[in-house]
Design a protein with these regions (language model features):
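Catalytic cores of alpha/beta
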Residues: 300-312
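Single conserved hydrophobic/aromatic residue that forms the stacking wall/gate
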Residues: 2-13, 380-387
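Glycine/Thr-rich beta-alpha phosphate-binding loop at enzyme active sites
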Residues: 240-283, 287, 291
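Non-globular sequence segments
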Residues: 103-161
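Alpha-helix-loop-beta-strand connector modules within alpha/beta enzyme cores
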Residues: 77-96, 186-214, 269-291
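Cysteine-cluster motifs in flexible loop/terminal segments that predominantly coordinate metals
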Residues: 333-379
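Glycine-rich, proline-tolerant flexible connector loops at the mouths of alpha/beta enzymes
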Residues: 60-80, 104-110, 168-191, 255-273
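Conserved, mostly hydrophobic/aromatic
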Residues: 26, 50, 54, 91, ...
Length: 387
């Protein structure tokens, strides 16, 4: 069979002394694999399988620098470093770079934890619901500075674990502070664009100082007129990105802002958004900065991914659901077998639905996904068709 074009996807690129083996990125996703915030054997199997399949850059999503209730990895104590190091070593064995996405939720973690420890569950629920709407406006400057300190400490721990990249999460609390919809503050963190992005810029500069030799990736969460709330407005995104480069950002992951409650905004099922629906916006950022940019959003086959690279709209192609459906993208492309890639159908049944129901990430097209340590599938390939 004729092979789809894949030119450019196998090209290497370099940042801050790190060499990335190709242009294929697994973006930050909530997986549900962590046990009480600890890196689990399920994590190890899943991310190692992606690395073995040829992914060049993996980002571990939603890594919390505090002991939060988020069902995500946590790195707030030195005792957690060895598990992250084991994961980094495992993916490094296949030449893959590992990033951790550091975030802080949009609620007062210490207050919520205190109510939980006192078993005041009704009050805790009320406080959480309140904070999700108003913490952005009510957090004191002292608290915001404390959050920056904790995120920097998390970055240092990640560096000690051998992680290659720190990705700053541009959504959640950080994105809410940037947002014209969520930020109603009247102090130096609210109002004008310069004020709304002040926290993000202070955070970026602080992390740059804390880990001067590491690659800093920034998830640039953008609100469009149609979708999203907790991020920078599309009209302000270029200026914001240029400021962040001045502050020390080495690369951008351009994505739809997802603080909205509507998962179809950022993880659109079939028929809801066109293929590559955020690529043009990534291209607008790329034109304005001199650092690599990754694009994401319904990029589902090798030909489409190659066109993103060839067109100059992005330097890196990030694919979440497509790599759940087939983790062997990289090796199949390298072998000239791109037509064997199992294509994601955007059904959202094994992935998004599972996470929304507090289960773990899986895929209806890939029986291994989430069970990498106990299952192995023999896949049909074009070689078999030629026999």
């Amino acid at each position: 069979r004729d092979q789809p074009r894949s030119r450019g996807l196998g090209d290497v690129y370099k940042r801050q002394g790190q060499t990335f083996k190709n242009r294929i990125m697994f973006p930050p996703l909530t997986t549900g694999y962590e046990k009480n915030g600890m890196i689990s054997e399920q994590d190890m199997g899943f991310y190692t399988r992606l690395a073995k399949g040829g992914v060049g850059y993996i980002v571990l999503g939603d890594v919390a620098p505090i002991n939060s209730f988020s069902p995500t990895p946590k790195l707030f104590d030195d005792s957690q470093i060895p598990a992250f190091k084991a994961l980094a070593d495992s993916v490094h064995a296949y030449g893959t770079k590992l990033g951790v996405q550091i975030f802080h939720p949009e609620y007062d973690v210490d207050a919520i934890n205190s109510l939980f420890m006192q078993k005041k569950f009704d009050e805790m629920r009320q406080r959480l619901h309140h904070d999700m709407m108003f913490f952005t406006d009510e957090a004191s400057e002292e608290m915001l500075m404390s959050i920056i300190d904790k995120m920097c400490a998390c970055a240092v721990r990640a560096q000690k674990a051998g992680v290659d990249v720190i990705q700053i999460h541009g959504d959640r609390l950080n994105g809410c502070l940037c947002s014209t919809r969520m930020n109603h503050r009247t102090d130096k963190f609210g109002g004008s664009l310069e004020n709304r992005v002040r926290f993000a810029r202070m955070l970026t500069r602080a992390i740059r100082k804390a880990v001067p030799d590491m690659v800093i990736d920034y998830k640039l969460s953008i609100v469009t007129p149609q979708r999203g709330k907790g991020g920078i407005d599309e009209a302000d995104a270029v200026q914001f990105a240029q400021w962040l480069v001045e502050d020390g950002v080495d690369m951008f992951h351009v994505a739809q802002a997802n603080h909205t409650g509507n998962m179809a905004d950022t993880i659109p099922p079939m028929g809801v958004q066109p293929y590559g629906f955020f690529v043009k916006i990534a291209g607008d950022i790329k034109k304005a900065v001199n650092v690599p940019v990754s694009a994401v959003g319904r990029i589902v086959d090798a030909d489409m991914a190659a066109r993103v690279i060839e067109s100059g709209m992005a330097d890196i192609v990030a694919m979440g659901r497509p790599l759940l459906a087939d983790p062997d993208w990289g090796t199949k492309i390298a072998a000239g077998k791109a037509c064997d890639i199992r294509r994601c159908i955007s059904c959202n049944k094994g992935c998004t639905d599972a996470i929304q129901n507090r289960q773990f990430l899986s895929c209806v097209l890939n029986a291994e996904n989430g069970y990498e340590n106990t299952r192995s599938c023999l896949l049909y390939t074009s070689d078999a068709a030629d026999d």
